């Protein structure tokens, strides 16, 4: 099953997340099919906190991909701003 979820990156105590399309059986930070955005929870100043490719996300959802709870919240936030 294909899922859209967060993959953690960044340094210790400074998380940075990639929004990725991946097989649900792969590890959290492992192999992925496509990167569709990023989320920086500790962005300050003019730093961009969230960027999502909504067209590609809708494409994958149309193909049957499931979306994690946190990513669905981020999608709603991105649609408010857009």
Curated annotation (Swiss-Prot):
It comes from the Bacteria. Keywords: Ribonucleoprotein, Ribosomal protein. InterPro entries: Ribosomal_bS16, Ribosomal_bS16_CS, Ribosomal_bS16_dom_sf. GO terms for cellular component: cytoplasm; small ribosomal subunit. GO terms for biological process: translation. The keyword Nucleotide-binding does not apply. Coiled coil: none annotated. It holds the Pfam family Ribosomal_S16. GO terms for molecular function: structural constituent of ribosome. Belongs to the bacterial ribosomal protein bS16 family. NCBIfam families: S16 (TIGR00002). This is Small ribosomal subunit protein bS16. It comes from Photorhabdus laumondii subsp. laumondii (strain DSM 15139 / CIP 105565 / TT01).
């Amino acid at each position: 099953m294909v899922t859209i979820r967060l993959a953690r990156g960044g340094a210790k105590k400074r998380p940075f997340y990639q929004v990725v399309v991946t097989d649900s059986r792969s590890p959290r930070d492992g192999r992925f099919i496509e990167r569709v955005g990023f989320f920086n929870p500790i962005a300050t100043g003019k730093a961009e906190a969230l960027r999502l490719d909504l067209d590609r996300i809708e494409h994958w959802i149309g193909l049957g991909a499931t979306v994690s709870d946190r990513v669905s919240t981020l999608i709603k936030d991105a649609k408010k701003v857009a």
